[in-house]
Amino acid sequence: MDVRQSIHSAHAKTLDTQGLRNEFLVEEVFVADEYTMVYSHIDRIIVGGIMPITKTVSVGGEVGKQLGVSHFLERRELGVINIGGAGTITVDGQCYEIGHRDALYVGKGAKEVVFASIDTATPAKFYYNCAPAHTTYPTKKVTPDEVSPVTLGDNLTSNRRTINKYFVPDVLETCQLSMGLTELAPGNLWNTMPCHTHERRMEVYFYFNMDDDACVFHMMGQPQETRHIVMHNEQAVISPSWSIHSGVGTKAYTFIWGMVGENQVFDDMDHVAVKDLR
């Protein structure tokens, strides 16, 4: 488990390129036949990936020991979105078939979660966010047909994108975790511009569906102290509440966003005008 400490905005603005990457970038999300796990002190979110190929991968008691509990989800909820081939997730003996861009919410208290791919030639890639939970909501599969899509932006401003809301109150109940998938239209490069912060939530972006020769310049920092981190395919970045979170790519891309914090009101944002950015 890779543990990341919280960081003050006054400290963050003094960091060089490698310093920013060390604090906020999750460089390797998927490793064959393993789970990756980054634990952030910011709202206690855990992010990572699971790519089973030649064997199943389980997340159980060994992680619980690191968290001071008997098993991983004893006091946590889990959200998973599959960006790879078809797979299965078995929760305490109940098997769910999770296809490409299907998702699974796992409620607090589940003791054993086992991940598998159906075809080793096209393995599943399970990206997950995990957050502290105060009560148990039912485990539920969510398909792309069930999400709440919203299309925003314009081709003229190169930010035409569709936001697919997987884990939001309109789709299912969670304690605090919200997740979704945003896909840019072909030829569009910007996400979340004009940008915003949200004092009451933190967020993690996971960029994927990118060519090897492409990258995204992920914008971060306070609106008057902006910085950037260069992101490549299948990498994630942690965004504290005080930071903007926006990006511009060399080509169109897709990203998964996950939020935890005070509320689940999607539009609870502190908007920043482009003219006010520095």
From Swiss-Prot:
InterPro entries: KduI, KduI/IolB_isomerase, KduI_N, RmlC-like_jellyroll, RmlC_Cupin_sf. Its cofactor is Zn(2+). Zn(2+) binds at residues 196, 198, 203, 245. Binds 1 zinc ion per subunit. GO terms for biological process: D-galacturonate catabolic process; D-glucuronate catabolic process; pectin catabolic process. Pathway: Glycan metabolism; pectin degradation; 2-dehydro-3-deoxy-D-gluconate from pectin: step 4/5. Homohexamer. This is 4-deoxy-L-threo-5-hexosulose-uronate ketol-isomerase. The gene is kduI.
